[in-house]
Structure formats: C-alpha cells, structure tokens
From Swiss-Prot:
It is found in: Cell inner membrane. Part of the ABC transporter complex MetNIQ involved in methionine import. Responsible for energy coupling to the transport system. It has also been shown to be involved in formyl-L-methionine transport. This is Methionine import ATP-binding protein MetN. ATPase activity is inhibited by intracellular L-methionine. Binding of methionine to the dimerized C-terminal regulatory domain stabilizes an inward-facing, ATPase-inactive conformation of the transporter, and as a consequence, the rate of ATP hydrolysis decreases. ADP is a competitive inhibitor. SUPFAM superfamilies: ACT-like, P-loop containing nucleoside triphosphate hydrolases. The lineage of its organism: Bacteria, Pseudomonadati, Pseudomonadota, Gammaproteobacteria, Enterobacterales. PROSITE patterns: ABC_TRANSPORTER_1, ABC_TRANSPORTER_2, METN.
Length: 343
C-alpha cells in the first residue's frame, strides 16, 4: 500500500545544509498498522510528511496504492491525497465550527451533496464514539474527544491510508490507550492501512504489526513487533524496549548496591525473558542444576505483537562459580542477563 524507496530529504537554511532523511526505504502492506519510532529530531515527522508530499523528497520514490506521487501534477496530487487521511499531535479543529461542521469540512470542500454529507458525518461520529456530540464545539471537548473528531475528519473522504503524526503524545495515558484502541478497531473494521510515528515504544507495543527504528535520518532496524522485541539488533531498539519493560530497583537495595563484589555479597540480576523462555521454569531449573537460590525482588510481564515478554529483578545466592555457571546457562536458554551490582 505504501512503498518508500531511497527517500532522501535535504533542507537548506541559509548557508547550512541539513539532511533530514538519508536513503530511507519502507514498505507498509495493505491493512497493516506500521509504527516508526525514534527520538526527537530523528526524522520521523519528515518521513511521514513525505508520504503525502507535504514534504517533497529531494530524492526517491513515493508509491501509495500503486501510484507514484512524485510525478503527479498538482491537480492529480490533490485527488490522490483524498485517499490519504492524516491526524496530528495538535488537533487543528476549527473553533467556530461544531463537531459536525469540522468533520463535514473536507466533504463540503469536495462539493459532496448535503444529504450525503449528513449521512457520512453521522456514520463517522458513531464510529469514533461521538454520536451524541454533533452540535458541541471543540472548546467543550476533552483532548481525547478532540482527537476523535480529528480522526473522523481524516476518514471523511474514505481514505485507504491513515497517517498518524505523534497523535497521542499530547494525551494522558488513559486517553492514549482509548485512542489506540479506536485506531486498532478502525483498522480491523475498515481494513485501513495505518502508518504512525511515535517516540513511545508503548504505542508500538499496543497496536502495531511492524515497527521501524529511525535514528539520524536513517532506518536502522525494521521487522515485526514480536521479532524486534524478541531479538533487537541495535542498541537504540534495546533502549526503547527497556523504556516500556522496566523495573526500578527498590530504594533500600539502591542504598546497598555496589558496583564491585565484596565479602559475602550476592549479585543482583536483571533478567529479560522473551518467547518460549517466558513460560519455561528456568529459575527453578538453575536451582536444581547449579545449587543456587533465587530471591525474586520484583517482576513484570507484558505482550507485544502477540508475543509474551517478561522482566525480573532477582538476587542469586550461591558460590561465585555456581552463580556464573547458572548465569551462563540462562543466557544459553535465551534469557538476557544483566548484573546490576552486588548486595
């Protein structure tokens, strides 16, 4: 549905040249929810704005639904953009128009008959859960409701693609979850292809099928969400994953934790389990095999891309030789082990 090939984007600011994107290629199959994650300034917004040519690439090809956008005339591009809806971090609603009027705007601009406008807007407001807000004004809506109006407006022309530019970053966690569930529901009901950009791995984890990691204008990793979570290939991907699967060391342990081993100490470990290692009784097996005892301090389990993930903080009691052997055995069985220090 979306195929970006060798996209490069260069900005000129006076005598300065800024390369925002460097030879980026990305393929989003029809019906998928695809996430692009990166830190601020990585090139995410520039990338998504290249899809509908709000930013025209310096080099490269933009194919949407089989149509090469970069070769179209202005009138042809305007027509093609009707198949590409877009929502933003800021809702960009017209304060002087009601909810109905905001959603109706793109249809009115397209000279859609009034009866069809009324039918379509009513249908969309029901879809986004705002069937009772036809006559409300944006000033009377919550942030989540405003974003729902923006989603309905983006769907007014019945697009095949929806672009989401940090669409939940201005919302509180509970509202973010509800908007993500709405996007997932729309994707499922309408078969809509969704490309979203975010700096939060939790967004990717909740609804995306695939994810690409962008850094300094380059895609450094891309795969299914389950594969990236199970086997991250880059330090940046690992960092994003740890941001969504994290456990804080309790304060009383932080006060006692030392970087180097000392007499009668035990190592504190951070264990990450993915795939089959989540459900396997690996800690009890290490106790039997290596004569070590594991004191679990805290643990957390979650899902991403249909795959289960777990993280655990534990003390491992035993001789140095036994604990080293147990750690090596866990690593052989696809558990990521990090020695945080000694207590």
């Amino acid at each position: 549905m979306i195929k970006l090939s060798n996209i490069t984007k260069v900005f000129h600011q006076g005598t300065r040249t800024i390369q925002a994107l460097n030879n980026v290629s990305l393929h989003v199959p029809a019906g998928q929810i695809y996430g692009v994650i990166g830190a601020s300034g990585a090139g995410k917004s520039t990338l998504i704005r290249c899809v509908n040519l709000l930013e025209r690439p310096t080099e490269g090809s933009v194919l949407v639904d089989g149509q090469e956008l970069t070769t179209l005339s202005e009138s042809e591009l305007t027509k093609a953009r009707r198949q590409i809806g877009m929502i933003f971090q800021h809702f960009n609603l017209l304060s002087s128009r009601t909810v109905f009027g905001n959603v109706a705007l793109p249809l009115e601009l397209d000279n859609t008959p009034k009866d069809e406008v009324k039918r379509r807007v009513t249908e969309l407001l029901s879809l986004v859960g705002l069937g009772d807000k036809h006559d409300s004004y944006p000033s009377n809506l919550s942030g989540g409701q405003k974003q729902r109006v923006a989603i309905a407006r983006a769907l007014a022309s019945n697009p095949k693609v929806l672009l989401c530019d940090e669409a939940t970053s201005a919302l509180d966690p509970a509202t973010t979850r509800s908007i993500l569930e709405l996007l997932k529901d729309i994707n499922r009901r309408l078969g809509l292809t969704i490309l979203l950009i975010t700096h939060e791995m939790d967004v990717v984890k909740r609804i995306c099928d695939c994810v690409a990691v962008i850094s300094n204008g380059e895609l450094i990793e891309q795969d299914t969400v389950s594969e990236v979570f199970s086997h991250p290939k880059t330090p940046l991907a690992q960092k994003f994953i740890q941001s969504t699967l994290h456990l804080d060391i309790p304060e009383d342990y932080q006060e006692r934790l030392q970087a180097e081993p000392f007499t009668d100490c035990v190592p504190m470990l951070r264990l990450e389990f993915t795939g089959q290692s989540v459900d396997a009784p690996l800690l009890s097996e290490t106790a039997r095999r290596f004569n070590v005892n594991n004191n679990i301090i805290s643990a957390q389990m979650d899902y991403a891309g249909g795959v289960k993930f777990g993280i655990m903080l534990t003390e491992m009691h035993g001789t140095q030789q036994d604990t080293q052997a147990a750690i090596a055995w866990l690593q052989e069985h696809h558990v990521k082990v990090e020695v945080l220090g000694y207590v």
